[in-house]
């Protein structure tokens, strides 16, 4: 397995809308394994393929971080959503930054698993929030896009400053 490079906001490639997956081969299985490895290494609970510059509709999730309840959603679609909730969200593509994003409390998702078989998933709480966050990535949206223009600009400035510090220390 290999670690993948996570794109950092405001990288324009994060705005790319992902294409559906149609081939479920060994290469896809390896890529999904690498997504999980990257997600755990970066201490995240979810990762969308677009965040690692692969513009396919693939999401990996493990909200407990135990590796025992891994979820793979390929070509996910939210069919129903109910209730209102929201938390201060973070994101591997916006390291160290958080912002409140309103979300639906419960979602019903249709997706495919690693083998291409369709399934339905009812999710609520943190899992529902994570699914919505990652599907946003597949649609070229980062959580900062849900924030006010002023907050979004401040986030960009903080990240650019951080990137300059990292480059300076290399």
Curated annotation (Swiss-Prot):
GO biological-process terms attached to the record: co-translational protein modification; translation
Q: Which cofactor does it need?
A: Fe(2+)
Question: What catalytic activity does the UniProt entry give for this protein?
Answer: N-terminal N-formyl-L-methionyl-[peptide] + H2O = N-terminal L-methionyl-[peptide] + formate
Q: Does the keyword Protein biosynthesis apply?
A: yes
Q: Which UniProt keywords apply?
A: Hydrolase, Iron, Metal-binding, Protein biosynthesis
UniProt KW Hydrolase keyword: yes
Q: Name one Pfam family in it.
A: Pep_deformylase
Please provide, alphabetically and separated by semicolons, the GO molecular function terms listed in this UniProt record: metal ion binding; peptide deformylase activity
Note accompanying the cofactor annotation: Binds 1 Fe(2+) ion.
The annotated active site, in chain numbering, is 134
Gene3D superfamilies for this protein: Peptide deformylase
Supply the NCBIfam families for this chain.
pept_deformyl, PRK00150.1-3
Similarity remark: Belongs to the polypeptide deformylase family.
**Which HAMAP family does this one have?**
Pep_deformylase
| Name this protein carries in UniProt | Peptide deformylase
Species name for this entry? Answer: Histophilus somni (strain 2336) (Haemophilus somnus)
Q: Gene of origin?
A: def
């Amino acid at each position: 397995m290999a670690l993948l490079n996570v794109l950092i906001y405001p990288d324009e490639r994060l705005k790319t809308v992902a294409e559906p997956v149609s081939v479920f081969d060994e290469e896809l299985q390896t890529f999904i394994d690498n997504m999980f490895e990257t997600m755990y290494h970066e201490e995240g609970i979810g990762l969308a393929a677009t965040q690692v510059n692969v513009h396919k509709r693939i999401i990996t999730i493990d909200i407990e971080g135990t590796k025992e309840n891994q979820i793979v959603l390929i070509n996910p679609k939210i069919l129903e959503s109910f209730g209102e909730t929201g938390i201060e969200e973070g994101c591997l593509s916006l390291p160290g930054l958080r912002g409140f994003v309103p979300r639906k409390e419960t979602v019903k998702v249709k997706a495919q698993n690693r083998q291409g078989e369709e399934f339905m998933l009812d999710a609520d709480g943190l899992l529902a929030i994570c699914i919505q966050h990652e599907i946003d990535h597949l649609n070229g949206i980062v959580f900062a896009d849900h924030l006010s223009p002023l907050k979004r600009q401040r986030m960009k400035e903080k990240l650019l400053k951080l990137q300059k510090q990292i480059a300076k220390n290399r």
